[in-house]
A protein has these predicted regions:
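Glycine-rich, aromatic-flanked loop segments that form ligand/cofactor-binding clefts
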Residues: 112-134, 265-277, 319-342, 380-387, ...
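Carbohydrate-binding surface patches
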Residues: 62, 252-253, 263, 667-711
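Aromatic-lined carbohydrate-binding/catalytic grooves of carbohydrate-active enzymes
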Residues: 344-484, 493, 498
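Polysaccharide-binding surfaces and accessory modules of carbohydrate-active proteins
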Residues: 51-58, 63-66, 73-284, 300, ...
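C-terminal beta-sandwich/jelly-roll accessory domains of carbohydrate-active enzymes
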Residues: 694-762
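Conserved, mostly hydrophobic/aromatic
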Residues: 62, 182, 309, 424, ...
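Short Pro-Gly-centered flexible turn/kink motifs
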Residues: 129-134, 304-323, 752-759
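Active-site neighborhood of glycoside hydrolase catalytic domains
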Residues: 414-416, 448-450, 454-612, 624, ...
Length: 762
């Protein structure tokens, strides 16, 4: 410490000697402005090097995240993984790296200093300075009113500029989840420009890193990819806005110290970003084999000007850790999602019949009433009227016209929506209706009246997707309009219980008539924030209405939207074979309670595939069960089967919605056999789903070792959705130990064979 102080005083002495030798008054003033911040920074570094490191412990029941910092020094990231009861020794941690190769692992690295990795924060300050070096100020932790939740705030400031950053960590003890975001505050005299503003930087050290993430397309969402990370960078990102999760999803699994994926064993970190706009997850492995994960809003074309006194809050990043493989990480996320991440995550959405694939745009009151009658006769609990019910000057008889004109179509429904909703209620069904309030057809009264509300750049054409344009949610007037669409739809009847909110295009060739010309790059952030402002207003007025997030299927499957929505429409592809992979991938990060899954007609309208009614039901029952077909086209045998399957589903629905998920194999396995089971929290009941996804012949006999059961408890197995079981174990009782270690071998010799088995503790 004494040596550091000696060096500091020598530096100050030499500086003032320089002033005496070279100092004209005006030059002296300029040099002081340059040197005094340098002296302050030097002093901070010298003092912090001598001061003891403080340990910042952010822990749950089984997981710890540990930072260290000294006053005026940098904030270091020391650990994320299994819980450490006493992390104090990490105050003395040394990385043994040469300083000229880069800094230690920083909690929130910025452009500046010795950080050579991609920064979490990149800023141009008001005076043009492009460097930022964050220094520790203080930290504090407090338990929230929910005693399960602890919040820790770490305050930092730039060593030379009036720019502050707060890192906010929220620990959920029982769920073993830690979330984090950053708050950036401008105290400078002029505006600063944020070029990169990630939510989180997570440095990790392991021998190997296996990245698991989701990719896909429309009607082929949530396909699973495994990549062994090597030196360099890999990014998962979306630049599409609105429908951000078709091609990539803002979530990942990292298996540490292994190049193989396992459901049951190994150290796994899971992350998911709660953001409905463009996102970016960057994975960078450096020369020390340190992996740094950056996660947050995508900085691409999104420079954000922060005026003096303004703050910018990044989206929330969600992390968990497990030593029990991918399955353990998924269950942690599912528990957190039901308790905190999904709007009313413990509320069950009713089984339903959706009109879309059964009627499309061609319906009237008679058609809808018949569908309602059929839904009631099969035991369904809700009827949802999809697209096509609105527009008069430009009637919504196809996708070319009417979108934006939210008046009830008098030709189709002369007695209005209340007439249909009341009829559904009279049959014992709830009623839901479809809207797409963020969009507009060129052929609409809204487009004629408010061309300035349409997202388009000046002097360029506004391209259409699905024959529609995007409304500019950066504009408060458009936010008012979108809220009004929801509000006025609810006023059509006091018997509307459910809203399906759709969004059928991305954003491209963007431009805003509302934003100033020099702030057009705010569009990508402000659109998502405008969407959230609308949803906040909706939930304040309609806290109990069920709302589904649909965006051409699974285009909004992420935790930013789920804060306001009860469920998502997992995919527009309702074909059961395709759904095996779609629902499997989705389940890695999102629980069954949020997954809409429908039984549709065969041949399927998306793929043309022909599958038996039992296979379609058994697949759909692994999520929130619904139907999407014309019931009058079903055979009597299919109707009878549907009644039985729906009744069975209600018997075990709570286990699927609220239980622990155990995946047994994957739909990618060469065997073509795949299973999953849900186990109640008290382990007294479980439901097992098994599927044959390709022809097995007589040579491949699958065995399923069950998971999550109490080894000392006996479980009686009952096969559902069959007249007579062909399985030798049906109706018999086995210990959880036997079922886990020896397993069972359901008979599934043919493609599209499937089984649903209810296990009950004796």
């Amino acid at each position: 410490e004494a040596a550091g102080i000696t060096v500091l005083f020598r530096f100050i002495s030499y500086s003032f000697a320089y002033f005496r030798i070279f100092g004209r008054r005006n030059r002296l003033k300029r040099m002081k402005k340059l040197l005094i911040p340098l002296i302050a920074a030097f002093a901070a570094n010298t003092v912090s090097a001598a001061a003891p490191q403080q340990v910042i412990d952010i822990s749950t029941d089984k997981v710890s995240m540990v930072l260290t910092a000294a006053p005026g020094g940098e904030v270091y990231f020391r650990h994320f993984g299994g819980r450490i009861d006493d992390p104090a020794p990490l105050a003395d941690y040394k990385s043994n790296r040469r300083s000229d190769h880069g800094t230690e692992d920083l909690a929130y690295p910025a452009t500046g200093g010795r950080n050579f990795r991609e920064p979490a924060l990149r800023v141009t300050h008001a005076d043009g300075d492009m460097n930022t070096e964050l220094r520790y100020v203080s930290h504090a932790s407090k338990q929230l009113s929910d005693k399960n939740v602890t919040e820790t705030v770490v305050k930092m400031t730039d060593c030379c500029q009036a720019l502050d950053v707060e890192l906010v960590f929220t620990a959920y003890a029982r769920e073993n989840v830690i979330t984090t975001h950053a708050v950036i505050r401008n105290r400078e005299k002029g505006p600063v420009t944020l070029h990169s503003f990630y939510s989180s930087s997570l440095p990790l050290k392991a021998d190997k890193y296996l990245l698991t993430h989701l990719y896909g397309a429309w009607a082929r969402e949530a396909q699973v990819d495994h990549t062994l990370l090597t030196h360099g960078s890999k990014s998962i990102e979306s630049t599409r806005e609105v429908r951000t999760t078709h091609t990539e999803n803002p979530a990942f699994l990292l298996t540490l110290n292994s190049d193989s994926f396992s459901e049951t064993c190994g150290e796994v970190i899971a992350g998911a970003l709660a953001w409905s706009g463009n996102f970016r997850l960057n994975f960078e492995v450096d020369e020390f084999d340190v992996l740094t994960v950056l996660a947050g809003a995508n900085p691409n074309a999104s420079e954000y000007r922060l005026r003096p006194g303004e703050t910018f809050t990044t989206p929330e990043m969600i992390y968990t850790h497990s030593f029990c493989g991918a399955g353990g990480a998924s269950r942690n996320l599912h528990d957190w999602a039901r308790n905190y991440g999904i709007y009313h995550g413990h509320e069950v959405v009713p089984t339903l019949l959706n009109s879309w694939e059964g009627a499309y745009f061609k319906f009237d009151a008679k058609v809808l009433k018949q569908m309602i009658d059929d839904a009631a006769s099969m035991g369904l609990e809700m009827f949802v009227l999809d697209d096509g019910w609105f527009g008069n000057k430009y009637p919504r008889n196809n996708s070319n016209a009417g979108l934006g004109d939210w008046q009830v179509n008098a030709a189709k429904l002369p007695e209005g929506i209340d007439h249909i909703a009341s009829y559904a209620h009279s049959k014992g069904l709830k009623f839901g209706i479809w809207i797409e309030p963020e969009m507009v057809n060129p052929k609409s009264e809204l487009a004629e009246k408010h061309p300035d509300w349409i997202v388009r750049p000046p002097k360029r054409e506004a391209p259409t997707t699905r024959n529609q344009w995007l409304l500019d949610l950066t504009n408060p007037k458009v936010q008012d309009f979108v809220f009004g669409v929801f509000d006025n739809t609810m006023k059509l009847s006091d018997k509307i219980d459910y809203i399906k909110w759709d969004a059928n295009r991305n954003a491209n060739n963007v431009g805003s008539a509302y934003l100033p010309a020099d702030e057009q790059s705010r569009f990508w952030i402000d659109y998502a924030q405008g969407f959230y402002k609308v949803m906040e207003r909706i939930r304040a007025k309609y806290p109990d209405v069920l709302i589904q997030a649909c965006a051409s299927g699974g285009g909004r499957v992420e935790y930013g939207a789920m804060k306001y929505f009860n469920e998502v429409w997992t995919s527009d592809n309702t074909e059961a074979l395709s759904r095996a992979r779609i629902q499997y991938g989705t389940s890695l990060f999102y629980p069954a309670v949020v997954m809409g899954s429908h039984v549709s007609a065969t041949p399927n309208h998306q793929t043309g595939n022909i599958t038996p009614i039992k296979f379609r039901f058994d697949m759909a029952c692994a999520g929130r069960l619904g139907m999407e077909l014309q019931p009058k086209q079903m055979t009597d045998e299919e109707r009878q089967f549907a009644r039985r399957a729906i009744a069975s589903y209600k018997e075990y629905r709570d286990i699927v919605m609220q239980g622990d998920l155990y995946r047994i194999g994957t739909p990618y396995d060469k065997s073509g056999c795949y299973g999953l089971m849900y186990v109640s929290k008290d382990r007294k009941q479980a439901v097992l789903f098994t599927y044959s996804l390709r022809y097995q012949g007589r040579s491949l006999i699958p065995k399923f070792r069950l998971q999550g059961l109490d080894p000392k408890t006996g479980y009686t197995i009952r096969e559902l959705n069959v007249d007579k079981s062909r399985n030798w174990f049906d109706g018999k009782t086995f210990s959880g130990e036997m079922l886990s270690n020896a397993g069972i071998n359901p008979s599934m010799p043919k493609i599209y064979d499937s089984g649903v088995f209810l296990l009950t503790a004796e």
